[in-house]
Amino acid sequence: MSVRHIMETILNTRLRKDKELQRLIDFFEFGSCLDKRFAALSGGQKQKFTIILVMMQKAELTFYDEVTSGLDFETRQRLMEKMAEWYRDKENTLVVVSHYYEELEQLADKLLILDQGRVIACGKKEELFRAYCGKAILILENTLSNRDLVRDFTALKSPDHLIALSCADREEEERITSILIRNNVNFKRSNSDIEIMSINAKEAFYEGREDK
């Protein structure tokens, strides 16, 4: 059975008459898959198929649980960009469960951070970032020379290969960036890095606790 027939059967519709379904298929560039057998679809194409079926329900509240699990980075990125674009001007509420921070940065405006079943933090993304990271962070490679260069500034918890510097205000940010630029150090600025924010939220949650 072709993907087209499976889709029409599940949705109880006919593609040639369903303008909304046609629009979703065009939006996700899925037209070339319609005459294939489902087993012949790639992982990314199967995820598109599932997402189209979900979106056709027009639900006020939709759960996406690890929707890009098993896909390569490039396919994940393209799929999440498409989802973010589709929902941008809509009033639907999405609950997205993901271990990929870049997905949450694209789709989420509120976060619930869990660790081993414990609620670490919950709130608006911007408020959580400010609470655990500051106004902005500057991220650079973790090298001996870089550590020495920024030793007088506040370093946040971060992945081992990175240094993340907290900037409490514009003046501090300008002071740090001036030093980095003067010393020809590559860096990235962020005011929404969910990975580093989550690491520091966990650090604050477990600080002083014996049940880590």
What are the language-model segments listed below?
Residues 168-212:
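C-terminal coupling/interaction segments
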Residues 62-65:
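Catalytic Walker B motif of ABC-type/P-loop ATPase nucleotide-binding domains
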Residues 91-97:
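Conserved H-loop
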Residues 37-41:
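Conserved ABC ATPase signature
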Residues 51:
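Hydrophobic anchor residue at the start of the ABC signature
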Residues 8, 17-33:
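Conserved ABC ATPase "signature" region
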